Swiss-Prot record:
Its EC number is 1.2.4.4. Pathway: Lipid metabolism; fatty acid biosynthesis. The branched-chain alpha-keto dehydrogenase complex catalyzes the overall conversion of alpha-keto acids to acyl-CoA and CO(2). It contains multiple copies of three enzymatic components: branched-chain alpha-keto acid decarboxylase (E1), lipoamide acyltransferase (E2) and lipoamide dehydrogenase (E3). Required for the production of the monomethyl branched-chain fatty acids (mmBCFAs) isopentadecanoate (C15iso) and isoheptadecanoate (C17iso). Belongs to the BCKDHA family. InterPro entries: Alpha-ketoacid_DH_E1_comp, DH_E1, THDP-binding. K(+) binds at residues 189, 194-195. It comes from Caenorhabditis elegans. This is 2-oxoisovalerate dehydrogenase subunit alpha, mitochondrial. Its cofactor is thiamine diphosphate.
Amino acid sequence: MHRALLNASRRVATVRSMASTVEGDAFRLSEYSSKYLGHRKAAFTEKLEIVNADDTPALPIYRVTNAVGDVIDKSQDPNFDEQTSLKMYKTMTQLNIMDRILYDSQRQGRISFYMTSFGEEGNHVGSAAALEPQDLIYGQYREAGVLLWRGYTMENFMNQCYGNADDLGKGRQMPMHFGTKERNFVTISSPLTTQLPQAVGSAYAFKQQKDNNRIAVVYFGDGAASEGDAHAAFNFAATLKCPIIFFCRNNGYAISTPTSEQYGGDGIAGKGPAYGLHTIRVDGNDLLAVYNATKEARRVALTNRPVLIEAMTYRLGHHSTSDDSTAYRSSDEVQTWGDKDHPITRFKKYITERGWWNEEKEMEWQKEVKKRVLTEFAAAEKRKKAHYHDLFEDVYDELPLRLRRQRDELDAHVAEYKEHYPMLETLQSKP
């Protein structure tokens, strides 16, 4: 009798222990999920296994067309009308022609600096077309096509590259550092990656203001993704659930550093899920795919779920006019990419097969754009430069005494030594 009671007591204790264990495990898993894992479900395991990064499958590359421009799955074709399609093509080719002329002009010493977008025209136009005018854009320095799509004029481009008095930035920035409040494009700054956390801040402000049909979009390259500010921005956006799209142009090189020396994981997109970002990798030379991906990303971002897009592309040009890429890559590599996978060539086939484009129209358009670029270039070259008084303006509503004194001292200096300042004749009249 005593032994039976003892065994029964042990069984009850065992059941209670098991119940307590189950309850304890459930408690811990619930706590881990809500407090540590972003509400993701996890389970305990008794199998010791370290995740092998080399065995983790890479994220797929979304595409609509193949390398020669054929639509693979008709259901993925956004079916643009003729007007929209031609605007897309003309924006890409206009950018390409402008790049060629301004690059050559820098080599002639007529402007001080330039950066081309050769080979990346598709991700500019495809993404810009999927956004809304009210969306706030933070660019890096290779997004001229986004501005073209938004209506930034050829005159604006030329004035900025010359830094003349009609430049929207009053000549205070080096070439390629565009910005326009009217087009919701924040002025570009030179320090790498600073725009990412700034863009997240803007997106957070939209969320706080309950601006329900506006997002922030920030463009950056693979090199910028290696900077600490990128990781801070990813975490900031995911934690605060901001309406933002991170658009990474992975073009293979951070100036001279190839991507193989920048990261050991699954590219830039591979970082997204780890930070809690909704993520897609897209063929950046496929305008249709970039458009679809960006449009869907915008829909998701509007629900306060940040999205990372990695656009796989290739930089056909040098990093800038200060770079000679033949020092770190072969001309054969560049030629092969240009011949086998160019976004303009791919989309040209798309519109040609629909009867919207032909070689005669191509020749007429090329001639028209070259004339327009050269005309605006010549006009910008002749315009006066901003007066040096502008150095003191646009910070304070009313110029403080110390700045007025500095301005007056500069006036006195220039008046005394004006023979040493021949450029005074090229300046706009004193305000």
